[in-house]
Amino acid sequence: MAKLLSCVLGPRLYKIYRERDSERAPASVPETPTAVTAPHSSSWDTYYQPRALEKHADSILALASVFWSISYYSSPFAFFYLYRKGYLSLSKVVPFSHYAGTLLLLLAGVACLRGIGRWTNPQYRQFITILEATHRNQSSENKRQLANYNFDFRSWPVDFHWEEPSSRKESRGGPSRRGVALLRPEPLHRGTADTLLNRVKKLPCQITSYLVAHTLGRRMLYPGSVYLLQKALMPVLLQGQARLVEECNGRRAKLLACDGNEIDTMFVDRRGTAQPQGQKLVICCEGNAGFYEVGCISTPLEAGYSVLGWNHPGFAGSTGVPFPQNEANAMDVVVQFAIHRLGFQPQDIIIYAWSIGGFTATWAAMSYPDVSAVILDASFDDLVPLALKVMPDSWRGLVTRTVRQHLNLNNAEQLCRYLGPVLLIRRTKDEIITTTVPEDIMSNRGNDLLLKLLQHRYPRVMAEEGLQVVRQWLEASSQLEEASIYSRWEVEEDWCLSVLRSYQAEHGPDFPWSVGEDMSADGRRQLALFLARKHLHNFEATHCTPLPAQNFQMPWHL
């Protein structure tokens, strides 16, 4: 009876992975209640085959879930319509509640029938036995056997806790349950006395900004968190997970962040290969509709690196909602997991981000300054210009206030706090992070990210002459035109390197540098072009084109 109840309340099972011979438990290991035997690919098909009763019951419950999601998103309009028609009176609401209660009882009955279907299936019974054994005893053997299954991630046991590193428990300066530290925007009206009257005047605007950010704004910024989109992508995500586990020997893990969100991660270890880059770990930060199952993780994988992918809060197996604070909390526990559980030193970690993932990547670089390098692909400097691009001009004040208070993705500000090597990849046909049209390459916000970084690190070089010549170089529409500008100013790379190395040897590596202070205008132009070319590479593609492995290069450093 207990097993039947477990089948009724248990998670949905999607797939049974093929188990490699090298990973199977030795035959001499005795079978115990906490060490059950996982299925081999020779005995069962790798796709879980539900019985007819479970299959049809699952379809009914999935359909009900979709209808509930549609009702949730359309509830404001439905409420307004029912109110106008007078259907919200007590005489109408009471019968409706009876109908709703009857429907819930029917769905509960369907769930029980699904449980009976699972109970009659030996595949599911063996899975639920392994799952229960792992929750009782998280031994390495139980975890290894549980990893052979792909199921609803909410039931996966937590593998790593944000407080697990001993240094976190002893230090008061680490993150609290309120979250890690973020750079906060300055007040919009500096110098104004923050009296009670001013607070009352601002209250309607603050409430409006909050409602916009938590309804339309967050879903526009992170469409991957919308349940209906995830439901449509589920088959693709399952295929991507199967590829990572079966072909790349990936290991899935659940991390608990300081805000209570559970973060879904996938680790592919290449340290045992002959490739030297396998000793380096690339932590991948996906875009606003990207998942590690099908996202930018494929680029460093193809290049031979060890890779750690993770999903934003609210994406696929990760819980929560993707606001900046939650994003930073998630990135923090991912980096801690890489250092304290996977055993990588910060000097062996590379942060790689695509598009909106640049926020968490730059936060990690700012918060963990010893990481080896940062690579930002198709990213931007600040969210406000891109948000203003897609909203009516009359909403400018509301949009700016909402972004600054609730959705402040200040990539450039965070990146300038990092002292290590940086590479920016600009897509020359990008249709997402341009503020006008894709053909207008100067409206690509990657340009502004580069300029802000160089102006912070080399303010004397990026004075008037240097800034002007870098803008000309950024405006070049082809590699031939870029080379023409570079050769026009007769950039001597050996001279530039010697100047920079001499300055570093004398003054140290900390930015900003005053190099170029006593230099001629032509010298500053040469240095500015040299530095721009070293920090930014062009990729002739649109925003969502996968980056080829040959374009995944380590950033330049002295």
From Swiss-Prot:
Q: Quote the EC number.
A: 3.1.-.-, 3.1.1.23
Which topology term describes how it sits in the membrane? Multi-pass membrane protein
Active site (UniProt)? S355, D430, H507
From the UniProt record, list the reaction(s) this protein catalyses: 1-heptadecanoyl-2-(5Z,8Z,11Z,14Z-eicosatetraenoyl)-sn-glycero-3-phosphoserine + H2O = 1-heptadecanoyl-sn-glycero-3-phosphoserine + (5Z,8Z,11Z,14Z)-eicosatetraenoate + H(+); 1-hexadecanoyl-2-(9Z-octadecenoyl)-sn-glycero-3-phospho-L-serine + H2O = 1-hexadecanoyl-sn-glycero-3-phospho-L-serine + (9Z)-octadecenoate + H(+); 1-octadecanoyl-2-(9Z,12Z-octadecadienoyl)-sn-glycero-3-phosphoserine + H2O = 1-octadecanoyl-sn-glycero-3-phosphoserine + (9Z,12Z)-octadecadienoate + H(+); 1-heptadecanoyl-2-(5Z,8Z,11Z,14Z-eicosatetraenoyl)-sn-glycero-3-phosphocholine + H2O = 1-heptadecanoyl-sn-glycero-3-phosphocholine + (5Z,8Z,11Z,14Z)-eicosatetraenoate + H(+)
Any one Gene Ontology BP term: monoacylglycerol catabolic process
**Entry GO MF terms:** monoacylglycerol lipase activity; phospholipase activity
Domain AB hydrolase-1 positions? 281-407
One Pfam family named in its UniProt record: ABHD16_N
Top-level enzyme category: hydrolase
Q: What is its main location?
A: membrane
Into which family does the record put it?
Belongs to the AB hydrolase superfamily. ABHD16 family.
Q: What is this protein called?
A: Phosphatidylserine lipase ABHD16A
- Which species is the source of this protein? Macaca fascicularis (Crab-eating macaque)
Q: What is the lineage of its organism?
A: Eukaryota, Metazoa, Chordata, Craniata, Vertebrata
